C-alpha cells in the first residue's frame, strides 16, 4: 500500500474511532426512550443548528449535488437555491412553533405522536399512517446514505463496494445503537464543522492551483462549452431550461417542512432563546455550504484532467481532495481528514434516519399500539433492536453499487416532503384543520409521489418521466388541497383542540414564556 494511502487510512481510523467513543460515552447517559429519541429536550443552539443542517445535507451535498452540477451544468444550481429558501423558511416559521406545540401536545417525542396528540386521534389513525410513511421512505433515504459511504470507501481505497458498505454501516449503527439522540447530535455537530471546513477549503485551493485566467479554457477543454455550462438558465448542451425544469428544482424547498430527521431537532431544542440562536447559525451554515458545493463542481471541471465521465461525476469532490493533497501539496493525512468530511456528511444523515425510523416503530407502533404499559427500559431495548433491524434492511437496499445517490435522495425527499410538509404547516397555522383532513393529507401526499414516480403508463414511462415535473411539487399540492377540502367537509375541531392551538400561537401553557 502506498504511503499516501496509509496516511489516509490512519485519518479514517482516528475519525471512526472517535465517533464510536462518543456513542459509548452517551450510552450510560441514555436511560429512557425520551433520552434516546430527544435527548431530554436539552440541545443548545449550536448543536441543534449544526446537527440539523448536517443531518439534512448528507453525502448528497458533497457528492450528489456537485455531481449533478459537474455533469449537467450550473442549471442544476436551482436545486441549491430551492434548498436554501426551504431552510430559511423552515427555521423561520416551523422551528419555534413546532417546539412549543410538541410540548403542549402531551410532550410528544416523535412526529407521528405529535400528529396523534395534536388532532386528538383516539383510534391512532394518524399514528399508523404517519409511521408507515416514515418507514417506507426513510428506508430508501437511509439506503442512499449507506450507498454513498460504500462508494466513498470504494473510490478511495479500491476495496470491494460490499465490504466498504459493510464497514460504513457497522460504524454508523454502532454509535447510534449505543448513544441514541445525544450521541447522534454531538457527532453531527462535529461532522457539521468538518463538512464546512472541507467544502470551503478544497475548491478555493484548487481554484488557485488552476489559476483564474485558465478556468474558462479548462472547462471548454473538458468537453463542454463554458458559456453554456456556466449559464444557470441553460442545460449543459446550451438548451434553455423550461419553466417546469426550474419549478421542479426550486420545488425541493417544499420538502423541508416534512423532514422528520430535521423537525425532531426543533422539538429537542432546550429553550425558545436557543431556537432564535439556532436559526441564524443554521441558515448561515446552509448558505455557505450550498454555495461552495456548487463551486466544487465548477472548479472540478477546470481542475480535473481528464474530465470525469458522467457516471463518475459524484466522485468529483473525492478526486479533487486526492489530487490537491496527495500530489500538488503533498499532505495526505490532511487530505484524509477532509475525505472524512464526506464520510461525516454521509454518517450525519444515516444516523438521524436510523433513529427516526426506529422511533416510529418502537415508540409509535410498539409502545403506543402494542404494549402501551411497557416500562421505559423495555421500550429503550426495543428501540435499539429496531435500529439494528432498520440498518439491515437499508443495507440490503443499498447493495446495488449502480444506484444513484441523487436518485435515491430525490425519491425519498419527495415522499417525506409530500407526506408531512403540508400537514405540519397546516397543523401549526390553520386552526380549522382536523383529524380527517390530516389523515387525508398524509396518505394522499405519499400515494401521489408513489404513483407519479413508480407507476408506469402505457408506454412504460411514469408521469414524472413524461412531464418532467418533480413529484414533490405534485404530491405537496394534492396533500394541501385535500387537507383543506376534507377538513371543511367534516366535523370541526373540539374546543380543547382549538384552545391548544391558541395557547401555542400566543406562547402560553406550552413550556415557554415567549414566542420564537
What are these regions (language model features)?
Residues 179-188, 428-440:
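Membrane-helix interface "capping/anchor" motifs
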Residues 32-37, 103-107, 214-219, 407, ...:
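Short, Lys/Arg-enriched, Gly/Pro-containing loop segments at transmembrane-helix junctions
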Residues 1-63, 176-179, 204, 211, ...:
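Membrane-interface "cap" regions at the ends of multi-pass membrane proteins
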Residues 70-178, 265-410, 512-516:
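Helix-loop-helix junctions that connect adjacent transmembrane helices in secondary transporters/permeases
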Residues 20, 152, 156, 170-177, ...:
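Alpha-helical transmembrane segments of multipass membrane proteins
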Residues 1-23, 430, 435-516:
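A generic transmembrane alpha-helix motif of multi-pass inner-membrane proteins
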Residues 16-19, 55-56, 83-87, 134-135, ...:
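Residue-level recognition of pore/gate-forming positions within transmembrane alpha-helices
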Residues 2-5, 38-43, 47, 64-81, ...:
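Loop-to-helix junctions at membrane interfaces in multi-pass transport proteins
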